[in-house]
Regions:
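Short, surface-exposed "cap/lid" segments of acyl-processing enzymes
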Residues: 1-29
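Conserved alpha/beta-hydrolase
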Residues: 23-46
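Conserved acidic catalytic loop of the alpha/beta-hydrolase fold
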Residues: 49-65
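Gly/Ala-rich beta-loop-alpha elbow adjacent to hydrolase catalytic centers
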Residues: 68-77
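Flexible "cap/lid" loop of the alpha/beta hydrolase fold
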Residues: 78, 82, 91-115
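Short beta-strand/loop motif that positions the catalytic acidic residue
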Residues: 135, 141-143
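Conserved alpha/beta-hydrolase "acid-adjacent" motif
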Residues: 148-155
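Catalytic active-site module of serine/aspartate enzymes centered on a nucleophile-bearing elbow/loop
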Residues: 164-194
Length: 194
């Protein structure tokens, strides 16, 4: 099963419908034969761990899942993979959000009083570089192409260097970006997950 973890943060109302459904990702993956679950993240959660707990509660009982996370959803998905490694078979980090962006950090601080914990991390918010280097599951990284201020190429490159055995999937614009087309993403995901 593919579990899609949407992006977005506290500056705008983004849910699974806006991020995955409307752009055609969920339907496209199902048409390609994938079993797909796209839960909404816990919006305005005070920590990445709280988001991970929320996601864990949405996971079905049964076999391990493949987490496909977009943008800031990568931090929540990584926290889940670290907290419950027996539930996660592999991880796709698509369009990982660049940490240390002053504009985004200011928006988070304004919206969430506990922002310090949300902004902490190294390459990604909510996860230390040592935790990334300690991952022991298959990880694929899909960069934003072209890059933008929130999804920089350097973040994807740093993840590929830090995570043992991480592979790069072909990049594409992120949803709900107007240039996004679901077909390249669906092909990359179905090709990598088998």
């Amino acid at each position: 099963m593919l579990v899609l973890v949407h992006g977005g943060l506290w500056d705008e109302p983004v849910d699974a419908g806006v991020f995955w459904d409307r752009p055609g990702v969920t339907a496209g993956l199902r048409a390609a034969g994938a079993d797909v679950l796209a839960p909404d993240r816990a919006m305005r959660a005070g920590s990445w761990a709280a988001e991970a707990e929320h996601l864990a509660a949405a996971l079905p009982d049964g076999p391990q899942v493949v987490l496909v996370a977009g943008s800031n959803g990568c931090s929540a998905a990584l926290r889940l993979a670290l907290a419950a490694p027996g539930r996660v078979r592999s991880l796709v980090l698509a369009w990982p959000a660049t940490a240390g962006d002053e504009r985004l950090d200011a928006l988070i601080r304004a919206a969430v009083p506990e922002a310090a914990g949300l902004l902490a991390g190294g390459v990604l918010r909510g996860v230390t570089d040592a935790e990334l280097a300690g991952l022991r599951l298959p990880v694929a990284v899909l960069p934003a192409a072209p890059e933008n201020p929130v999804h920089r190429r350097r973040t994807a490159d740093a993840l590929l260097a830090l995570v043992p055995g991480a592979v790069e999937l072909p990049g594409c614009p992120e949803p709900p970006h107007p240039a996004f087309r679901p077909e390249p993403l669906i092909a990359a995901l179905t090709g990598w997950t088998g």
